Curated annotation (Swiss-Prot):
Keywords: DNA-binding, Repressor, Transcription, Transcription regulation. Coiled coil: none annotated. The lineage of its organism: Bacteria, Pseudomonadati, Pseudomonadota, Alphaproteobacteria, Hyphomicrobiales. It comes from Brucella melitensis biotype 2 (strain ATCC 23457). PROSITE patterns: HTH_TETR_1 (PS01081), HTH_TETR_2 (PS50977). This is HTH-type transcriptional regulator BetI. It holds the Pfam family TetR_N. Repressor involved in the biosynthesis of the osmoprotectant glycine betaine. It represses transcription of the choline transporter BetT and the genes of BetAB involved in the synthesis of glycine betaine.
Length: 198
C-alpha cells in the first residue's frame, strides 16, 4: 500500500513522467508501465492512483491546463491596463514552463489525438475558449467587440502555429521572438489599418 500522504507527490511525479514520455515519443501510444518506469514507481501504483492509461492522460492534460490557468491568473493580477493584460497573456503562453520542448510535443500529440477522443477534444476546446475570452476582454477595451474577436482569433492561431513551428525544430523562433511576433500582430491590428473586410 502507498504511504499515507504520498499520493499527491506520486500523482504529480506520474503526471510529469507522462509529459516527458509522451513528449519523447510524440504519441499517446505509450503504456502505463513506460510512464511508471519514467516516474520510478511500479505500474501497479500508477494504476492504483489513476485507474488506467486514459485517466492518466486526461489527468495530465488537466494538470497542464491548471498550470497554465494558475500562471495566467497570477500574471493578469499584475496588469493594470488592457495592453499589459494582453502582454501578460502572450508571455505566459510562451513562458519557460509552457514553451518547453517536451510540453510542446505533448500538447501537439493531444491535438492529433483529439480527432479520436471526445474527452481530449473537450479539454482543448476549453483551452481555446479561455485564451480567446481572456484576449477579447482586454481587446474590447481598445477596439470594437467584433474586431476584438477577430484579433483574438488571429492571435490564438498564431500562438498555435508558433508551437507547431517550434516542435518541428527547423528555424523555430525562441520564446522572446514568438512573443514579439504575436505582440506585433496585435499592435498592427489595433493600429487602425483596414481589415480584409474593408
Amino acid at each position: 500500500m502507498p504511504k499515507i500522504g504520498m499520493e499527491p507527490l506520486r500523482r504529480r511525479e506520474l503526471i510529469d513522467a507522462a509529459i516527458r514520455t509522451i513528449g519523447q515519443r510524440g504519441s499517446l501510444d505509450v503504456t502505463v508501465a513506460q510512464i511508471a518506469h519514467e516516474a520510478g514507481v511500479s505500474p501497479a501504483l500508477a494504476h492504483h492512483y489513476f485507474g488506467g492509461k486514459d485517466k492518466l492522460i486526461l489527468a495530465t492534460m488537466r494538470h497542464l491546463l491548471r498550470e497554465l490557468g494558475r500562471d495566467l491568473n497570477a500574471a493578469i493580477k499584475q496588469a493594470n491596463t488592457p495592453h499589459e493584460r494582453i502582454a501578460a497573456i502572450i508571455a505566459v503562453n510562451f513562458s519557460a514552463t509552457q514553451f518547453a520542448q517536451e510540453t510542446i510535443a505533448a500538447w501537439l500529440t493531444f491535438y492529433v489525438h483529439a480527432q479520436q477522443s471526445d474527452d481530449i477534444k473537450r479539454l482543448l476546446r476549453i483551452y481555446a475558449r479561455r485564451l480567446h475570452s481572456n484576449l477579447v476582454f482586454a481587446l474590447e477595451q481598445l477596439t470594437s467587440r467584433a474586431r476584438a474577436n477577430r484579433i483574438a482569433e488571429g492571435a490564438g492561431a498564431m500562438i498555435d502555429g508558433l508551437y507547431i513551428r517550434h516542435a518541428l525544430g527547423a528555424d523555430a523562433p525562441d520564446a522572446a521572438s514568438a512573443i514579439a511576433l504575436v505582440e506585433d500582430y496585435i499592435a498592427i491590428q489595433l493600429s487602425g489599418q483596414p481589415s480584409a473586410e474593408n
